[in-house]
């Protein structure tokens, strides 16, 4: 029997529903249960693929090519269970599906309404493909009281009736603010949030209360009394030094025990949290610190690089060092000739993905600085494209090398595959048309050159990595670039698409077209990030 746990949030946004959901899933998984997490997003966009990074943060890409909410990254990192496009539904997707059904005549002339048609579609999205699971945890985006969330709340209310109380549970995440002048935690916001939830017909069975300090028993009983839950079901979600402490912290508060008790399942045996304890030990007892400069273009909102930040921390865990990130806006290198010297103290330099011309010349300067000063370098997606252009301009005698993303160029080192392989049977994009759905998305196979650094890093020559890009490195320039010293050490199986480049004579210089950060886990760091941070450690010890 599949059990559904619905996680809602109240009082304020950004309380950490995604982390809480992932932590609970990890605890249930540590007890041997099969779990899956899903996210319902109340925005009207079909997916976040065309949303600004400043608006939405990172777009997390799944193996099957879905562009999803960044919370799905947390789900994967905490559980190791790969998400699919079925695990993220938006209002835009739901409405598009219902309207398409109406146009086909599926509703047989009925008046199409939010109830039952939209809510039925939401319920279908929640339960689809969950037959072989023990638990499905469903996070409802937004905050209770938002008008956008109402159809989703109504749908999960109906699901409790459809499935029965024995198969469903509602967990509500709230805030307990500390008021210094009063010297106490205030419970009134939580009470009002629960009342708001009750107004739409939902009674929470557990309250997860965010707080920067323990909840006194008197306040716990008060919350339980006013909010109609058991005192044991008032769980303190205390602030912790790292998100990876949440499973251990929530278990200490009895969260997983209370969930199992609600469903009438055995809860006497302790979960196996040994992997989480090893992660925490490595993070809390580092043997050094490395400084990595990240030269980006969305540094005003670090959520745009969420998976990257986590993957670098995973590399630190693998090497038992603390990773300190120095965020550098690429454009500063274009405005000042001396600004590039800020990279001199870095133990490693990373140029991440991005879109558009802004900051591209600054990134190219950062690539050159890393190459010329023997600083470990990792380029990702757009970062690889800039590394290739830098090589073409400064080593291969092609000063006009550029990307067609920035405009017409005589030397299109980077371009849409349609521009330099027109007619190829492997083309997956449309010229022109809508921006959504025009990228290379999802997991693709690649082959690595025998004896290359990247093959040594992976320990194998066949890999599968996730992509999200519209432009490709032009394979027609491979020969001239390799003569200049840049090895094409990873290619698509058909030898059409360059996947990895490296400088064999550099201490550690690797650039990849894909996004390795999307597959990294705290207890299973991605080899590229383990190797990159390891190279930074060697550089640190030489300084």
UniProtKB/Swiss-Prot annotation:
Keyword tags: ATP-binding, Glutamine amidotransferase, Ligase, Magnesium, Metal-binding, Nucleotide-binding, Pyrimidine biosynthesis
Gene Ontology molecular function: any one: metal ion binding
Amino acids binding L-glutamine: 54, 354, 382-385, 405, 470
First-level EC class: ligase
Annotated stretches, region: Amidoligase domain: 1-265
Sites where the protein binds Mg(2+): 71, 139
UniProt binding sites for ATP: 14-19, 71
UniProt binding sites for CTP: 13, 146-148, 186-191, 222
GO biological process: 'de novo' CTP biosynthetic process; pyrimidine nucleobase biosynthetic process
One Gene Ontology CC term in the entry: cytosol
Domain Glutamine amidotransferase type-1 span(s) in chain numbering: 291-542
Record Gene3D superfamilies: 3.40.50.880, P-loop containing nucleotide triphosphate hydrolases (3.40.50.300)
InterPro entries with a match to the protein in the record: Class_I_gatase-like, CTP_synthase, CTP_synthase_N, GATASE, GATase1_CTP_Synthase, P-loop_NTPase
Binding site for UTP: 13, 186-191, 222
UniProt pathway annotation: Pyrimidine metabolism; CTP biosynthesis via de novo pathway; CTP from UDP: step 2/2
Record has Ribosomal protein as a keyword: no
Catalytic activity: UTP + L-glutamine + ATP + H2O = CTP + L-glutamate + ADP + phosphate + 2 H(+); L-glutamine + H2O = L-glutamate + NH4(+); UTP + NH4(+) + ATP = CTP + ADP + phosphate + 2 H(+)
EC numbers, comma separated: 6.3.4.2
Enzyme active site: 381, 515, 517
Description of how activity is regulated: Allosterically activated by GTP, when glutamine is the substrate; GTP has no effect on the reaction when ammonia is the substrate. The allosteric effector GTP functions by stabilizing the protein conformation that binds the tetrahedral intermediate(s) formed during glutamine hydrolysis. Inhibited by the product CTP, via allosteric rather than competitive inhibition.
Other known facts: CTPSs have evolved a hybrid strategy for distinguishing between UTP and CTP. The overlapping regions of the product feedback inhibitory and substrate sites recognize a common feature in both compounds, the triphosphate moiety. To differentiate isosteric substrate and product pyrimidine rings, an additional pocket far from the expected kinase/ligase catalytic site, specifically recognizes the cytosine and ribose portions of the product inhibitor.
Function description: Catalyzes the ATP-dependent amination of UTP to CTP with either L-glutamine or ammonia as the source of nitrogen. Regulates intracellular CTP levels through interactions with the four ribonucleotide triphosphates.
Membership in a protein family: Belongs to the CTP synthase family.
Name recorded for this polypeptide: CTP synthase
